[in-house]
Amino acid sequence: MRLSRLLIGASLGVALSSTVFTAALADVKFGSLYPISGSLALLGEESARGLELAVDEVNAAGGIKGEKVVLERGDAVDNNQATGEARRLISLVGVKAIFGTYSSARVIAASQVSELAGIPYFEMGAVADEVTGRGLQYLFRTNPTAENMAKDSVDMLIKGIAPGLGKDPKDMKIGIIYEDSSYGTSVAGHQEDNAKAAGLTVVLKSGYPSNTVDMSSLVLELREKGADVVMQTSYQNDSVLFLQQANEAGYKPLAIIGGGGGYSMQPTADAVGHDLIDGVFDADYTQYAVNTSATPGLTEFVEAYKAKYGSQPRSGHSLTNYVGAKAIFQALNAGEGFEPDQIVSAVKALDIPDGQAAAGYGVKFGKNNQNERATMMGMQWQDGKLVTVYPENAAIAKMRFKK
């Protein structure tokens, strides 16, 4: 009798341990690689939240192919750490893919590690040309690019801002300033090309380190060149610094057009003051004050964000990462498995039409594994809020101009 009890107990123990082992096998691990400390932490963390919300949503619906998605975080505080964290996630954690990363410089560094290891890397926020311009087999980008941002900046000037000011855009003088990493350099280069192709006059194109603590000489140079339109591609600190020092110097261009980054963040408006930022334009990812008929699912995303994090989203970076991650998860669920080539095949077959995602655009990967359907929008700060003013089908407000 005692022996039979022991045998039953042993059998039960084996069954239980087998169940636990099977449950462990039912998890699929992905890396979440963003700058979550250091100077880019605010936007990095905001971006990571979008991925986390997409994971919550897919797990609530049964996971991917019946397997629960588990995220392992990595901190891409600088380029060296981004590389080291990519190695750790791949070699020690055993992730099936990496998602990230917001910073162009960080993803350019980290994706070289994943490419050599044959592990897919999904970039959902960095815009620089070089991200997808290196011909990597395992890197895919879901978000719009520096070229999209630059084109929208110039188009918005020609089609909306100049007419609203009663000006011929060819009579306006443009100053282009930018933080000098891959992000700012790419956007500024395309802005100059687009402006010149449209017959516009660029009087200054000047870069600076994003950690600069004084932009007064650049403000002076813009004024001396007679720039009445300033296009700035920047992170938060340098966005705040430029707006404050331009104001202190009494430099008031007819229009300022931000290139995402700090110009899309509510904390930037709060830091400089709503009166100072009022009227400033911005070309960037889809934001939240937008015509929701063009962005199905956006309202539900905002509600999920508030429920998880206890506040409104701080910028459109979370939304862009959420949309990208959801698209990849959809592809993987329709795919054959989680081996690298299976993931690549599944993602290449993805075909989401325009107007079916919360950011308003679709997803289909084309040349260099870039999402060829990704687009940006034009916004303006009005009464302390960033509202969509361009294109017309997504706008909820008309452009305002100071008399």
Curated annotation (Swiss-Prot):
Protein name in the entry: Leu/Ile/Val-binding protein homolog 8
Keywords: Amino-acid transport, Signal, Transport
Keyword Oxidoreductase part of the UniProt annotation: no
Record family assignment: Belongs to the leucine-binding protein family.
Organism superkingdom: Bacteria
Originating species: Brucella melitensis biotype 1 (strain ATCC 23456 / CCUG 17765 / NCTC 10094 / 16M)
CDD domains to which the protein is assigned, alphabetical: PBP1_ABC_ligand_binding-like
Signal peptide: 1-26
GO-annotated biological processes: amino acid transport
Pfam family, one: Peripla_BP_6
The protein's role, per its UniProt record: Component of an amino-acid transport system.
Gene3D superfamilies named among the record's database cross-references: 3.40.50.2300
